[in-house]
Amino acid sequence: KHHLEYHLRNHFGSKPFKCEKCSYSCVNKSMLNSHLKSHSNVYQYRCANCTYATKYCHSLKLHLRKYSH
């Protein structure tokens, strides 16, 4: 059922999940939770080989690939 609701929201442009801090809105709660990190000052993903730190796991993975740490 949830997959169908998500699918229909994508087709009809419905974005019921809204950020309380800015005008961002999205189709599901996990996307909103990811977006909320952009308002935080918490950089929980850190490179063990340099001073790089990020809010997002995928950004750290890209960093590690780019610099071959």
UniProtKB/Swiss-Prot annotation:
One of its GO terms (molecular function) is zinc ion binding. It comes from the Eukaryota. One of its GO terms (biological process) is segmentation. A zinc finger (C2H2-type) spans 1-11, 17-39, 45-69. It is found in: Nucleus. The keyword Nucleus applies. Keywords: Developmental protein, DNA-binding, Gap protein, Metal-binding, Nucleus, Repeat, Zinc, Zinc-finger. Transmembrane segments: none annotated. Signal peptide: none annotated. GO terms for cellular component: nucleus. Gap class segmentation protein that controls development of head structures. Belongs to the hunchback C2H2-type zinc-finger protein family. This is Protein hunchback. The gene is hb.
